[in-house]
Amino acid sequence: MKRDTKHIRAQIVNKTLNYIYTNIDTDISLDELARLNSVSKYHFHKIFKEETGENIFVKITSIRLQKAANLLITDNYSTITEIANNCGYVSPTSFSKAFKKRFTFTPSQWRKGAFRNFTKNKFDINDKSIKNFEGLEPRIKVIPQKTCVYLRLKGYTEANLIKVWQRLLAFAYQCDLKNNTHIGIYHDSTIMIPYEECNYIAALEVDENFEPKNSISKLKIHESLCAIFHYEGKYGDIERLMIYIYQYWMPKSGYEVITLPAYAVFSKNHYLEENDTFILDFHVPIRVV
């Protein structure tokens, strides 16, 4: 495959996924995604499947259900039907059926606390480990829009994360990008999604007029009100931090999450250090209840 062709295909996938995550509360059609990428429906479907190994409709459903699972935990004021609608479901029945198939529990059971059992089945989590985060309070601040170049990774393992960050830094060196802020974007939560299915974005903040090349793409992190948690830890602690934020802090905070992804701004990036320690500010886009 020619380099230009590979770049075009990567851009199609990246533009598509960014669009889905940003508009997950709407009815997203194949026609719409094909128009977005200026290709036929047939070629779009074929390219997305070949590049990601996933069916586009299965991917959209997975993203909808993950967003709903988060909202059921953090939004105590909306009904289950309203949350389903906010995640693109028109029929409460089809939503409940899909949710139970994905997470074992019904939306009602999940909201009443079954999510804690789901998490404990996936991680070695107990009240003692969560107590390490007690007293951790965020700053609430409006964060301006950021422009980033990035690489997307599917399959959340330490080895793969190190490789994708090293490749992004190699690109930065070739483009004479120096001292750019490192940002990790968490479209998929490892709390709810199997490691091998998670999509992670390694990003560098750049000037708005910077144009990437090769398989590197560009995105915008939209302006939003954020809860910002400053934390220093080691590899594996980010997952526990996310559990604390979404399952313990958020329900009592007077805020709720919105559909924009959370992201970490690294002062010390453990994927590029000799040891596995990090320093970061974890940003969670929110709104007042």
Regions found by a protein language model. Give the residues of each.
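N-terminal intrinsically disordered/low-complexity leader segments
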Residues: 1-7, 31, 38, 46-52
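A solvent-exposed interaction/effector surface
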Residues: 18, 42-49, 54-62, 66, ...
